[in-house]
Curated annotation (Swiss-Prot):
Subcellular location: Periplasm
Quaternary state and interactors: The complex is composed of two ATP-binding proteins (BtuD), two transmembrane proteins (BtuC) and a solute-binding protein (BtuF).
Known function: Part of the ABC transporter complex BtuCDF involved in vitamin B12 import. Binds vitamin B12 and delivers it to the periplasmic surface of BtuC.
Alphabetical GO biological process terms: cobalamin transport
Fe/B12 periplasmic-binding domain: residues covered: 27-274
Keyword Transport recorded: yes
Annotated signal peptide: 1-20
Name of the molecule in the record: Vitamin B12-binding protein
Gene that specifies this protein: btuF
Keyword list, A-Z: Disulfide bond, Periplasm, Signal, Transport
Gene source species: Vibrio cholerae serotype O1 (strain ATCC 39541 / Classical Ogawa 395 / O395)
Amino acid sequence: MLVIRLIACTFLFITPSLLAKPFPAERIISLAPHATEIAYAAGLGDKLVAVSEYSDYPPQALELERVANHQTINIEKILTLKPDLIIAWPAGNPPRELAKLRQLGFTIYDSQTKTLDEIADNIEALSHYSANPEVGQKAAHDFRQRLQDLRTQYASNQPIRYFYQLSEKPIITLAQGHWPSEVFSLCGGVNIFADSEVPYPQVSIEQVLVKQPQVIFTSEHAIANGHMWRAWQAELSAVQNDQVWALNADWLNRPTPRTLDAVEQVCTYLKIAQKQ
């Protein structure tokens, strides 16, 4: 359930906001794995002094001190580190502790993303905190160009029904309009639970059987799920046709430049399914 909490929190949307005029920051703390990646993309990696748990990309982030996780923020440690910029995650950071940081007067940038285009916006906005903003601006430009190329490349993909499984016990998926559903729709994917009234519905095997997805996606965090579906081979065409795929969860669930790697991965698998 920890994985689901981390993923679900990422999907919530708050427009990136700047609480103060951007300035070249010298000591930066990131409070979320995706924010750490965005900081590096924006050219701020050498200014990071601490990050959150699970900040494992790029590899040099592993060497930084940990000051936050999904349950808590170590405010005492942050005070000793004296950051001049904190990259926060309002949808995932503990709200009471985040509010305390604001009350203490820290400059905070709220990093949130709902769409693929907003990943580039996030990088670009953070680049203004760098002494060399052209680094982040180029990264944002390159992201937008690659995204446009992918949209053009896969624009003719035929619609295909998919099921994305986030966890096994309980079985949780996502509704349309919540991260990362745009990754699938760009590739021609049609979410079989798109009309769910809740963002991350808990569903039963029987519901999946009734909706008959042509492709089943699982995450690497739930790799055993692929084996779980083998028991239903006689009743699921996706299993019969070997269309059960494990996706790179970090690429897919973190809104960062690597999300475009997830787009290519998903599009490749859906293309295979469309040929059957």
